């Protein structure tokens, strides 16, 4: 009779560094919302990203500073509205980017019904 090991080994995903996470999210957010690449910004330099992280600056604040400084306009909003549409990123935009890049995993065990 053949025995199987009691513990099954799972594929372990390497843990991404905070800089790598920022790079993934910045790439997605800048392209989708402003039509830019990360190379169009100071964030193409990993040291700049690390400085922001070390200073406690949030991703949203970092991008929104660029929006204000360069008067960026969002390209992902269609049509016109009677209200002026804000060019700034919101928490929901970052959440959607986390989902799209696979950085946000939903656990069915943690869902409260």
From Swiss-Prot:
Pfam families: CbtA_toxin (PF06755)
Natural source organism: Escherichia coli (strain K12)
Quaternary structure (record): Interacts with FtsZ but not MreB.
Upregulating conditions: Expressed in mid-log phase at lower levels than toxin relE.
UniProtKB keywords: Toxin-antitoxin system
The keyword Lipid metabolism belongs to this UniProt entry's keyword annotation: no
Note: Encoded in prophage CP4-6.
Alphabetical GO biological process terms: negative regulation of cell growth
Homology family: Belongs to the CbtA/YkfI/YpjF toxin family.
Disruption phenotype: Deletion of 3 type IV toxin genes (cbtA, ykfI, ypfJ) leads to a slight reduction in resistance to oxidative stress, has no effect on cell growth.
InterPro entries associated with the record: CbtA_toxin (IPR009610)
Gene label: ykfI
Protein name: Toxin YkfI
Function summary: Toxic component of a type IV toxin-antitoxin (TA) system. Acts as a toxin inhibitor that blocks cell division and cell elongation via FtsZ and possibly also MreB (although no interaction with MreB has been proven). Overexpression results in inhibition of growth in liquid cultures and a decrease in colony formation. These effects are overcome by concomitant expression of cognate antitoxin YafW, which leads to toxin loss by an unknown mechanism.
């Amino acid at each position: 009779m053949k025995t199987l090991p009691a513990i099954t080994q799972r594929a372990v995903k390497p843990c991404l560094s905070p800089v790598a996470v920022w790079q993934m999210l910045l790439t997605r957010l800048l392209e989708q919302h402003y039509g830019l690449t990360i190379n169009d910004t100071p964030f193409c330099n990993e040291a700049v990203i690390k400085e922001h992280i070390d200073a406690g600056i949030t991703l949203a604040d970092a991008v929104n500073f660029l929006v204000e400084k360069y008067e960026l306009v969002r390209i992902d909003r269609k049509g016109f509205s009677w209200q002026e549409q804000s060019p700034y990123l919101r928490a929901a935009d970052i959440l959607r980017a986390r989902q799209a890049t696979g950085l946000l995993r939903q656990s069915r065990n943690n869902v409260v019904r």
